[in-house]
């Protein structure tokens, strides 16, 4: 009879100890969770700050930086490729998207107003004459022009024409390819190299150059050679296309040989930045 109260008191004490222990565990868990949330918030803020910093740096670096501060050779080449390759890659990606869209619409019977407008815009930008009649779309000409210039080929030509981004024309005009301005369209802004096209950014320079190769009558044979590769289901590469670029330089084949040799010498370095 005496044992029963003792057992009851013992049970009560055990329950109290259990409650106290549980409260401490919950308190610690809450503190840990709060600490984790605080850590995540700080990490998130750091990520936002990094993105903002990247955005600011991207805006600042829209023009070609002064690459002469890098030692000549590999360090300067790497700095140049880090600067120009994103724009070349982006340009070719945009072209590929438009080309794929054209291919997907090639056998389409009915066109929506939005599709007509898009086709009209592409034809205009690539200087392809089109009456607007969807039954008479110049597909061969469109697909011959709306195509990539091999990324490594563009990078090699930019490096060759600009001295890896150190020429006065590249630094002052953002002109990486030695593109001359048309008569009556040249602007003689202070500090710019006269007689040559001036661009507001590296991106604009790359876009103008690629568009020039894809539209100018002088490079018709280059585009036809590229179209033949497509027809044969072969890859459009720098190795295949550099020697197909005729009429680009007054030096003729010797320039193509020089360009190809430069590409071969820097092929691995360029590939590492693609």
From Swiss-Prot:
Database matches in InterPro entries: Bax-like (IPR053195), MGlyc_endo_b_GlcNAc-like_dom (IPR002901)
Record's keyword terms, sorted: ATP-binding, Nucleotide-binding
Name of a matching Pfam family: Glucosaminidase
Residue ranges, annotated region (Disordered): 32-74
Bias type Polar residues, positions: 32-64
Keyword Nucleotide-binding: yes
Transmembrane domains' residue ranges: none
MF (Gene Ontology): amidase activity; ATP binding
Annotated binding of ATP, by residue: 247-254
PANTHER family per the UniProt record, alphabetical: PROTEIN BAX
Protein name: Protein bax
């Amino acid at each position: 009879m005496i044992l029963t109260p003792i057992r009851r008191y013992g049970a009560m004490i055990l329950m109290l100890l259990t409650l106290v222990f549980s409260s401490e565990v919950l308190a610690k868990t809450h503190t840990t969770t709060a600490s984790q949330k605080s850590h995540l918030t700080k990490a998130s803020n750091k990520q936002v700050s990094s993105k903002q910093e990247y955005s600011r740096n991207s805006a600042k670096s829209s023009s070609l930086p002064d690459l002469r501060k890098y030692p000549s050779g590999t360090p300067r080449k790497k700095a140049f490729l880090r600067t120009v390759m994103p724009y070349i890659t982006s340009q070719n990606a945009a072209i590929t998207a438009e080309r794929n869209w054209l291919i997907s619409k090639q056998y389409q019977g009915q066109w929506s107003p939005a599709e007509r407008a898009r086709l009209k815009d592409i034809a205009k930008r690539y200087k392809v004459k089109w009456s607007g009649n969807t039954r008479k779309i110049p597909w061969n000409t469109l697909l011959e022009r709306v195509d990539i210039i091999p990324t490594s080929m563009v990078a090699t030509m930019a490096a060759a024409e600009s001295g890896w981004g150190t020429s006065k024309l590249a630094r002052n005009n953002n002109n990486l390819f030695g593109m001359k301005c048309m008569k009556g369209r040249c602007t003689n802004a202070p500090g710019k190299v006269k007689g040559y096209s001036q661009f507001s950014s590296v991106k604009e320079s790359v876009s103008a150059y690629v568009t020039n190769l894809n539209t100018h009558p002088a490079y018709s044979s280059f585009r036809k050679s590229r179209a033949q590769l497509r027809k044969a289901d072969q890859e459009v590469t720098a190795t295949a296309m550099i020697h197909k670029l005729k009429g680009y330089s007054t030096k003729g084949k010797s320039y193509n040989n020089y360009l190809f040799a430069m590409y071969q010498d820097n092929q691995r370095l360029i590939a590492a930045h693609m």
